[in-house]
């Protein structure tokens, strides 16, 4: 997967949300899309699922089965972000939502099921800043859940090919 694919899908999601939602940085549910990219064309993004709890959605076997035919999938969710400049905040367990410098953030994770590559973008509600992570840098419960979903989707894909 190329970084250009991430940029293009991030832009499509951003523009679409801005056109259709009053609060594109306060989503009521996390969203997942099946994604296909064809040379010279806009990416095809098919809504697959949404759920108010991202972890419930990512743990769903039916969602894994629904995304298995696609070469990629994208996850979009919103929440709070806080600067990591003060290590004591992290050590004290201060959640980003309570940090005095908190910001609304929308995260897009793009997963290539053929190469196991995961890229992400972060957009902030109070600026035009975009941070692109072209390497698999994430860690923690969200990354673990995304990797688990990818593994389960691959099992569904193998099972379907075996039965064809």
Show which residues each predicted segment covers.
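Short HxH-centered metal-ligating active-site micro-motif
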Residues: 57-94
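Short, surface-exposed beta-edge/turn micro-motifs
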Residues: 28-33, 70-72, 94, 103-107
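Short loop/turn segments at secondary-structure transitions that flank enzyme active sites
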Residues: 38-40, 81, 114-117
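N-terminal domain-onset segments
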Residues: 1-63
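Short glycine-rich, low-complexity/disordered patches
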Residues: 25-36, 72-77, 159-164
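Glycine-rich, aromatic-bearing surface loops/beta-hairpins
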Residues: 97-164
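Short linear motifs in intrinsically disordered
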Residues: 21-25, 94-101
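Short acidic, S/G/P-rich loop/turn micro-motifs used as interaction or catalytic elements
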Residues: 53, 80-83, 130, 137-138
